[in-house]
């Protein structure tokens, strides 16, 4: 698959989960199944603390979009987690109005495969080591840069380290919501705003 050609065809509004999986795979992240999602949630709770969506919520999201929760394994151990997904127009509106609940996610707000996204949401970034953190962040950057550059991309920081990491890769604080960060849409693939 030529990811740049596919990204150009999709005009920065990717509708295909397999494209997200292909970009994540370039950074050694794999789409997680239900068992691995439970493991990834435990990793996130251990690193971030309470306030992480339930395993069932994560599994429902993966079933809904197909490629939203990824993990990096090193020597068999899960060392990195990336969870991100496209929002439909209703989800984008809820996010902008401060009504988006990331812990008790309503999958009706998430774009389905084939549905044009109104925004993209970075839901969880967690890693147990430097290599895991780097893979997760670089996959996140490339997913945005190649597939979702024409829509706003959001993430919420729950730790000071998370806030710094988001700002290093181009996120800026949201104008009205504390803790929410955004990358504005670009005019073309690979262009930063």
Feature names for model-found ranges:
Residues 76-81, 120:
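Glycine-rich phosphate/pyrophosphate-binding loop shared by adenosine-nucleotide-utilizing enzymes
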Residues 68-73, 81-83, 100-105:
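Long amphipathic alpha-helical scaffold regions
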Residues 95-170:
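Acyl-donor binding region in acyl/amide transferases
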Residues 81-96:
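Short, solvent-exposed beta-strand-terminating loops
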Residues 2-24, 142-157, 164:
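Non-catalytic interaction/Regulatory regions outside core domains
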Residues 82-86, 149-193:
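Active-site/acyl-donor-binding loops of N-acyltransferases
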Residues 5-65, 69-78:
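Short amphipathic alpha-helix that is part of the acyltransferase structural core
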């Amino acid at each position: 698959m030529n990811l740049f050609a596919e990204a150009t065809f999709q005009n920065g509004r990717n509708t295909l989960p397999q494209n997200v999986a292909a970009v994540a795979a370039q950074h050694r992240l794999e789409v997680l199944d239900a068992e691995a999602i439970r493991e990834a949630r435990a990793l996130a709770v251990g690193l971030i603390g309470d306030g992480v969506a339930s395993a069932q919520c994560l599994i429902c999201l993966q079933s809904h979009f197909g490629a939203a929760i990824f993990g990096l394994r090193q020597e068999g151990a899960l060392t990195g987690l990336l969870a991100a997904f496209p929002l439909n127009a209703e989800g984008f509106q809820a996010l902008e109005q401060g009504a988006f609940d990331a812990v008790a996610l309503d999958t009706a707000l998430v774009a389905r495969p084939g549905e044009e996204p109104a925004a993209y949401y970075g839901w969880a970034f967690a890693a147990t080591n430097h290599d895991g953190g780097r893979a997760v962040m670089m996959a996140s950057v490339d997913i945005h840069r190649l597939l979702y550059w024409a829509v706003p991309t959001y993430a919420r920081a729950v730790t000071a380290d998370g806030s710094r990491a988001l700002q290093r890769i181009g996120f800026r604080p949201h104008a009205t919501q504390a803790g929410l960060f955004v990358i504005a849409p670009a005019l073309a693939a690979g262009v930063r705003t």
